[in-house]
């Protein structure tokens, strides 16, 4: 990661990994990443993801000059300027479009049926092809690539991520996004800035002839195939 001259405020790229990094492609993306001058890399290692993110947010709060946090794990690929692009959207909470890395390879946006108490991933073909998508009242999402402003971190802490105990949520990031919604924050998905999610291959949402496909990218960034949705 390197700093670049920018009128945008500095922040922290919060890299959350185990003691051994899973995918080299993710480290290549981090190495190429750019952020406004004054930004820092806040790298936290360990098996407890919730604690690592809490530590990363605490690092942001300890440095008044840092005005945002960008959450990233070691199983994603992304463009070098993704944090800058998300900052330019001027939203309090925003994530890039990201797909599930196992079937169905739909966005990591969760639709909740309050009547039947059921959940499903939102189908990719139902998503717009550009601009920002605002989560609906019965939707949640993952936190991969989330850019969250300092003011939101201040209001939602100091204990940001809860370790799962009751089983009422599927994962800690789901619980955290639900907390943000309850505090009155809107959450946006940037359809023009997207993540790859590394599984058997790197699964990426791509537009082909104006329609969404799931692009499968192998080692060396070699395109394997496009899956229609």
Question: Which sequence ranges carry the predicted segments?
Answer:
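Short, high-confidence coil segments that cap the C-terminus of an alpha-helix
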Residues: 65-66, 91, 185
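C-terminal catalytic/acceptor-binding lobe
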Residues: 3-8, 155-229
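Short beta-strand-to-loop acidic/aromatic patch adjacent to the donor-nucleotide binding site
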Residues: 64-77
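Anion (oxyanion) recognition and catalysis
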Residues: 34-35, 87, 181
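Short, conserved alpha-helix that lines the donor NDP-sugar binding/gating region
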Residues: 49-62, 177-178
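N-proximal low-complexity "stem/linker" segments adjacent to membrane-targeting elements
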Residues: 1-47, 51
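Conserved catalytic core of nucleotide-sugar-dependent glycosyltransferases
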Residues: 79-164
């Amino acid at each position: 990661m390197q700093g670049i001259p920018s009128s945008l405020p500095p922040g922290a790229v919060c890299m959350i990994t185990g003691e051994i990094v899973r995918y080299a492609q993710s480290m290549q993306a981090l190495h190429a990443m750019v952020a406004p001058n004054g930004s820092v890399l806040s790298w936290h290692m360990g098996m407890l993801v919730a604690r690592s993110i809490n530590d990363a947010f605490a690092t942001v709060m300890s440095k008044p000059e840092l005005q945002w946090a960008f959450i990233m794990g070691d199983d994603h690929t992304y463009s070098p300027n993704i944090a800058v692009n998300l900052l330019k959207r001027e939203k309090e909470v925003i994530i890039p479009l990201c797909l599930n890395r196992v079937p169905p390879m739909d966005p990591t946006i969760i639709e909740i049926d309050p009547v039947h108490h059921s959940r499903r991933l939102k189908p990719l073909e139902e998503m717009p092809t550009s601009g920002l998508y605002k989560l609906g009242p019965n939707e949640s999402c993952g936190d991969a690539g989330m850019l969250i402003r300092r003011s939101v971190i201040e209001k939602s802490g100091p204990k940001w991520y809860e370790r799962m105990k009751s089983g009422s949520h599927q994962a800690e990031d789901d619980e955290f996004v639900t907390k943000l919604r309850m505090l009155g924050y809107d959450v946006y998905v940037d359809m023009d800035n997207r993540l790859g999610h590394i599984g058997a291959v790197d699964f990426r949402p791509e537009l082909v002839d104006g329609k969404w496909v799931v692009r499968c990218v192998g080692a060396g960034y070699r395109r394997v195939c496009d899956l229609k949705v």
